[in-house]
């Protein structure tokens, strides 16, 4: 306590001195989030320590001046010496090789909810990159709403993903004008590669995404991918939109966007299968159901599930579009995504008499090449533990008709659409490598930013898997 008192006396003597931060970036020690360091920050830090303030991996970053992941008297000492003219330890900053998205929440409030949006200002600095259109400025920012998103990454990772809703439609980094986007924080290799495979095989819609560096409330947050939010829209999942609470039996047959995923959600129902397993179903559009809508979608998925488990082509083909299923399946086999038929499994349906569900779009390749015993390549449904046991897939692959459609799409896809994938991957890695290094400085020890080793390892795994798949599907049978 005596040391703390001495430091406070020293700080009072320096009360007229301040240090400015870079435009858009807070300097280390900016406890009060006013983009400068002065006596007020020292006072706030002292008060915080006396009241037992705890370190937070993101929001304490400018306050943890010596980067020891603690808020303590050492930080006060460094601040005071900085006001005397000594240099502070540098904070990680953006690489300057990608556009920078600045987001400042209202009142600089923390983003700590996946349910409640908070208001924020934003602007996009093109960083002089050719072909990139800047949006907004620090003096005239644009508006948005922002909240958390994700499951494992939100709950377990210090670096958080976000969902954003712009005040007005914008074309972000060349993507179609829209208000709804996600900021994906991880998987710099597997998500872009999985999405590119989806585009190449010809699924009707694949979310567009672009890399960007993010500064949140003046703190460098790292490398993110701005990604289109999956939603019903003429430029996204292009089905006729169904109104919330619709009761007309003709109108409730289509406009559906649903997801098979076990993470708990308020818009979710469960189907008990004959073997005692539970099939979890989320409904995204419409997202507020009348009794008629709930009865319709529940019965449709129940009938689909029952038909698949009976392993009768003539029955389950009534409910499943074979072409989209085959393309979706091939993409996930190529990247060996062991979670692909367990979570983030999107389905959609057009309006009309047809009862067929279409597979896609793809989303979340976080478990790509997640199998540890990979020395002998195998199919997704083989050698899988109970945690990743896929819904439906083991039954579907028993169908000769389905295998025939898979082989047809494989021969269209390989080798012509696959042969330049490694060039695409190398170009992607080259584009984001310096930003990935900056991200690694910001979030040391995290797996997703080790791009060089990831790239060679994943390409090796993909070559082996493609060779295996072509041996199974490439010849006429």
How does the language model describe each region?
Residues 109, 142, 153, 157, ...:
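Middle-to-C-terminal accessory/interaction subdomains
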Residues 40-43, 47, 74-77, 81, ...:
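Solvent-exposed, polar/charged alpha-helical surfaces in well-ordered, non-transmembrane soluble domains
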Residues 163-165, 170-171, 185-188, 202-207, ...:
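Internal "kinase-insert"/substrate-recognition segments embedded within catalytic cores
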Residues 91-193:
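Conserved NTP-binding catalytic cores of kinases and kinase-like/nucleotidyltransferase enzymes
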Residues 8-13, 18-92:
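Cellulosome-associated attachment modules in secreted, modular CAZymes
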Residues 113-115, 134, 175-177, 224-226, ...:
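Short, solvent-exposed loop/turn and secondary-structure capping segments
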Residues 1-6:
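Positively charged n-region of N-terminal signal peptides that target proteins for export
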